[in-house]
Amino acid sequence: MDLQLKNKTVLITGSSKGIGFAMAKTLAAEGCDVGICARNADEVNAAVAAIQAMGVKAHGQVVDVTDSASLEAWIKACAEALGGIDGFVANVSAGGADNEESGWRSNFEADVLASWKAVNAVKPYLEASDCGSIVSIGSTASLEAFAGAVPYGAMKAALLNYFGNMAQELAPAGIRVNSVSP
């Protein structure tokens, strides 16, 4: 499949395993250079090595997306190491936290606040690209009520709204914004 992504650069949060790593490998197979981040150094290093073995450039760092300085430093380092940024995928989620204040707080900080911070940090690079794009990895929990992980669904709904607004706000700058809910 040719997605016309050869020589483009995409950053993906939470990309050392799972859906994030699968996206990184798919983009690398299309000829994309990839920025990887996650919280585990061994997993980040293994993911970077696997992507580089596919014949493209990869840059990875240990990042806790709730740490603004770390998140912004990763974005800047990726832009420098990979020669700019054409796309950004907001993939990290705190997941199914308890329906307690701590669960709400961790989901808000990792999902919503980190996505907002990342979009603000990556926006200048995407404006400089001829194909700037942002993708948010959502969930059907943003649209349907599920028993259990209430904070998760609420934050995914907030992200769906936020990225919908960003699609309108960033369109004049030539930046596409989409949400995908696997």
Region annotations inferred by a language model:
Residues 16-18:
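Conserved glycine-rich cofactor-binding loop
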Residues 119, 155:
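Active-site helix of classical SDR
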Residues 93-108:
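Substrate-binding pocket helix/loop in short-chain dehydrogenase/reductase
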Residues 104, 145-153, 165:
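Active-site loop-to-helix junction immediately N-terminal to the catalytic Tyr of the SDR YXXXK motif
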Residues 139:
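Residue(s) in the substrate-gating loop at a strand-loop-helix junction
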Residues 27, 84, 160, 170-182:
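Conserved Rossmann-fold SDR core element
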Residues 124, 168-169:
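Alpha-helical segment proximal to the catalytic Tyr-Lys
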